[in-house]
Amino acid sequence: TSVRNEVIGVITTVLAMAYILAVNPGMLGGTGMGFGPVFTATAISAAIACLCMAFMANLPVALASGMGLNAFFTYTVVGGMGCSWQFALTAVLIEGILFILLSLFGVREAIINSIPATMKKAVAVGIGLFICLIGLTNAGITVGKDLGTVIGFVNFDVSSALVAIIGLFITIALYVLNVPGAVLLGIIITTLIGIPFGVTTIPQDFKVFSLPEAPHFFAFEWSNVFTLKFFIVFFTFLFTDLFDTIGTLMGVTQQANLVDKEGNIPNVKGALMADAVGTVAGACLGTSTVTSYVESSAGVAAGARTGLASVVTAGLFIVALFFTDLFAIIPSAATAPALIFVGYLMMKPVMQIDFEDPTEGIPAFITIMTMPFAYSISKGIALGVIAFVFCKIFGRKLKDIPVVTWVLGVIFVAYFIFEAVK
């Protein structure tokens, strides 16, 4: 690698995930927290977590407040259950502290290393399809239909979809021509193309530079910690964050060829610790669970390979504090082509899956299929592990099931039962 490649990769990653700086404050702001304080908390907690990733694991994986987890925070915990946002932040804090302990004692590392090699490859492919679907959805290329057609292709009279498709083919052309930073250039060019289409909008009160607002420091609520409601919220945050992070780390490191022959991640303990520290920092500052981002794959595709990428990413998140409006004008139609294209790049491990052996191929297929269609990395891993144990039992290959995988299978079955009855 080189400093130039790392920087190009970082900028690509940050642009691909810059939406979180607008989406997360907008979402959590609806709970009464306010856009400005949450924006500041989102950027600072992401910077802290990225620095931890750089110095603890030397990996090019970016972290920030997780999509999905922030929706659960806002619409389920606060909106649906009627809890305060301080209550939700307390659950995030305790989850993060527990993750630090689990990381210190190697529990999370043992879980990752226990996942069979075939399943690790399937996770990478499934994540590729998942982020491809995110890109297609964000751009409005695929849209929900009636029950007869669950998902459909948009008409080309939708400007954002048209701009995104143009941007996708521009990105493909740049990549095929071996142009350095093809994904990043694709984002920039698509943003510019979006101006005459009205997709890229520059507000009248646009300011290049602005001072950040103070976040909500240590805004916790301890009075309802020992309740069933708190346990349900805490457990949901815990499970989703744990396996989303595991899946993302496996997917990104495999794409970057940073794994060993067994598919294990180097310095995984440090990577998991960075994720946990980021979550604690985020809760203390006033934002939802911090987790590893699948959009890091876009940066890897553009050249990021080491912790230097994470250091620069952290720096850019701090810089973003003072350029809120500049990041906000990059439309989802411009980042969508990057996510769709990275989905292609993450398909490669599928060729290494042994589909001739149904005890390997079926669990891999279920993992790959579940992630995009259930819109969940964690549920893809859970169903895949259950299917792996099931197939090995009926295939009379019990010796192929590691002890920890047995335990995970039981935990995942219990989790789905818990989800059904809660």
Regions found by a protein language model. Give the residues of each.
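Helix-loop-helix junctions within the multi-pass membrane cores of secondary transporters/permeases
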Residues: 1-24, 45, 66-75, 79-127, ...
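Helix-loop-helix hairpins and the membrane-proximal interhelical loops
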Residues: 1-37, 152-154, 184-269, 412-414
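Alpha-helical membrane-protein architecture signal
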Residues: 4, 166, 231-235, 270-277, ...
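Hydrophobic/aromatic residues within the transmembrane alpha-helices of Major Facilitator Superfamily
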Residues: 11-18, 48-51, 136, 242, ...
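Loop-to-helix transition at the N-terminal end of transmembrane alpha-helices
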Residues: 32-51
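Juxtamembrane transmembrane-helix boundary signature
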Residues: 47-67, 97-98
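Membrane-embedded alpha-helical modules
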Residues: 81-196, 200, 311-422
